[in-house]
Amino acid sequence: MIKTLFNKNTALAAVAILALSGSAMAESAKTHKTDMAKKKVSELTCEDFNGLEESFKPTVVGWVVGFNKKGKEEDAVIDVDGIETVTPAIIEACKQEPKASFWKKAEAELKKVF
């Protein structure tokens, strides 16, 4: 089983960089991603998550898995196989309710897997 090390600062930097990248995006998409990069993860909606590139969604899910239950930053070992299993479920849940809290949807799906 492959394990990966994440911490809050690394994940947030990655979210900001990837959310702001991509020169071929439409202007409205750039505005959406810029706004998203300014939000706390607890403020993200499923709509924000749905707007990410598919290849980046497992990284965001991995960060959520690594965040401790008290909401404080903590280094964590991540189960990559588990993330690959739960990411499609989170994507589907967010497609069903785009205005819902991404954090709450992710937590609900994570409880089913971890």
Swiss-Prot record:
Subcellular localization: Periplasm
Disulfide bonds: 46-94
One BP annotation, GO: cellular stress response to acidic pH
The keyword Signal appears for this protein: yes
UniProt keyword terms in alphabetical order: Chaperone, Disulfide bond, Periplasm, Signal
Signal peptide span: 1-26
GO cellular component, one term: outer membrane-bounded periplasmic space
Family that this chain belongs to: Belongs to the HdeA family.
HAMAP family noted in UniProt: HdeA (MF_00946)
Biological role: Required for optimal acid stress protection. Exhibits a chaperone-like activity only at low pH by suppressing non-specifically the aggregation of denaturated periplasmic proteins.
Protein name, UniProt field: Probable acid stress chaperone HdeA
Gene name linked to the record: hdeA
